[in-house]
Amino acid sequence: MLFRSVPRIARDPWNLDRTPGGSSGGASAAVAAGMGPLAIGTDGGGSIRIPASLAGIYGIKPTYGLVPIYPFSAAWGLSHIGPMTRTVADAALMLNAAAGPDARDPFSLPGPRVDYVKALRGGVKGLRVAWTADLGFAKVVDPEVKAACERAARRFRELGCRVEEIAPKWPSPQAAWKTMFLGGIAARLGPALRDRRDDIDPGLAAIADETRSWSPTQFVQAWFDRLAWEEHPRRLFERHDLLLTPTIACAAFKVGLDGPGEIAGTPTGIYDWIPFTYPFNMTGHPGASVPCGFTRDKLPIGLQILGRRFEDATVLRASTAFEKIAPWAHLRPPV
């Protein structure tokens, strides 16, 4: 939201002093609290998967263009629309309704239409699964989060998958993503920053101010850097069917903050706690967050399941297979 029209902030139903994440945090909190069975999220850097992880629900960012976007968001080229639900089956049902081409979105994907509910019936035996706790560039991951996700990754062996821990040496794409993402927000604000600055969220106004000194060449270079970085997951998916990571590097932190400030004693910047989400907004791969455990403070932890582009059905199938051996829908927050 660009303007400060909402007087209250969303809180995590598992602990009202903690954040449900964003930017679809209100959606995740509502679903987790039982206010409704499903919600739509928009994800330009993790805004489906982050709040799904923090609130202990399921969320999937589909392949870029599978669900059309109109009108375009500030994060065009990065933004995906997808379901946030208590169960994988509900997410598949939502995708059946939402996926498909739209003439108003030139990036929306054509058919053929896929029945994602039907796709849940297949198994995952024989799938080649890669697991990494850092992608090669995560600054720090909370030990409880890492341990829970590692246990969850190992459980895919029970499903008949071939699980391999990998140690990629990928460079961080944060600078390119930040340029594209923040530049889009600044451009979208446009005249409003001049005419209604007092009504604009201070954080967004600060973002717009920061980007004013950036040159057009920086923005174009970010797109080239994006294309270059896409080679890393492309090569990985030549050898593996799925990639597993923590959804984010920590559990829910204090409400009202932009980040935890530190993780396991290591100081963190504003984007250091989401190193696993925004890279795949740049590549367009489908990615889901599945609940996979809790911290000692009873805060949810999410495992991210990523697949090849256009193979959303495989991500959903893996998600429902994990859900069957590690169910979560019966777990309810204390609200």
Language model segments and positions:
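Short helix-loop capping/hinge segments that flank enzyme active sites or metal/cofactor-binding pockets
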Residues: 118-133, 180-234, 246, 250, ...
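Acyltransferase
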Residues: 118, 141-167, 189-195, 219, ...
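Short glycine/serine-rich loop segments
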Residues: 1-102, 281-302
